[in-house]
């Protein structure tokens, strides 16, 4: 063996070790070789009992495994320790929607029981509690910054809506008195205009006529029952609403007018279809005839029916199978369109009667 090989082997133990110590998050406790490995854990069990007061972060239960599950306002740690998320009172309870599980929760009020109803909103404090009644009242009246900055605009728009409602009530009262000839005293007219205003609001929200009238009547009855000084006006309300329903109807543009029965609507619709059947608009006179005929359509037809008829008889542009001219002239319109099939620009010459706006 050569000298250099012997020197190299002699220096190998002197080299620094490549082993690096790794620190872990937990430390295993030291124990004797003969100690029992299955001995019971120490310092486990409930730390707070039923009805006991707890603060945020206080430990309620130490356990190995989920013997108890976290309920309302209770959190669970990685070692299954249950702790309070809100200040309150400890409750041990069972949840019928989770059979076989025992829960620990924190009630925010001393007389509050858990669990609350399954579909009821949760009672939460978000980690904050105002012990002073004056501070709590101030906090309730406080507005978010965005709302505070827009407060003037919000109040202004609310006042504008209130003024618009009063104006509509005045218009309804004028129509009932002057156009429909309903003889109502002051109290009955107030009830009638309020009822019609609510019916109009429901119609704008998408309800049909029957549902809109039912909802308006139901709302007024409930509010009248909850107001002791107005309970005596219940008979007057029913009588007024019956007379108003028999004398009024709303158009599809939400305009108030005389009552139109279902028979009248069907007869008007059939007469309109008979009058316009097979009509092809070629002149301005024919166009004006259709416009005049559809003027009262909003009173007899629903909005969808009126739109369907207008699209059928008042088409802005006729299909290209009609009113196509052979050569350009004074009464024609030239249209240039790119043809993606041929890659060229096609020239289409159409008569002016093909366009409704040019008649």
Curated annotation (Swiss-Prot):
Region annotation (Disordered) maps to 29-48
What is an annotated GO biological process for this record, any one? translation
- UniProt transit peptide range: 1-24
Q: Where in the cell is it found?
A: Mitochondrion
Instruction: Enumerate composition-biased segments (Basic and acidic residues).
Output: 35-48
Per its UniProt record, what Pfam families does this chain match? Ribosomal_L27, Ribosomal_L27_C
User: What PROSITE patterns has UniProt attached to this entry?
Assistant: RIBOSOMAL_L27 (PS00831)
* Gene3D superfamilies with a match to the protein in the record: 2.40.50.100
- Keyword Protein biosynthesis carried by entry: no
Main location class: mitochondrion
GO molecular-function annotation terms?
A: structural constituent of ribosome
**What keywords were assigned to this record?**
Mitochondrion, Ribonucleoprotein, Ribosomal protein, Transit peptide
One CC-aspect GO term: mitochondrial large ribosomal subunit
- Taxonomically, the superkingdom here is Eukaryota
* InterPro entries per the UniProt record, alphabetical: Ribosomal_bL27 (IPR001684), Ribosomal_bL27_CS (IPR018261), Ribosomal_bL27m_C (IPR041244)
What is the role of the protein in this entry?
Component of the large subunit of mitochondrial ribosome.
User: PANTHER family annotated for this entry?
Assistant: LARGE RIBOSOMAL SUBUNIT PROTEIN BL27M, RIBOSOMAL PROTEIN L27
What does the sequence similarity comment in the record state about its family? Belongs to the bacterial ribosomal protein bL27 family.
Name of protein: Large ribosomal subunit protein bL27m
Origin species: Eremothecium gossypii (strain ATCC 10895 / CBS 109.51 / FGSC 9923 / NRRL Y-1056) (Yeast)
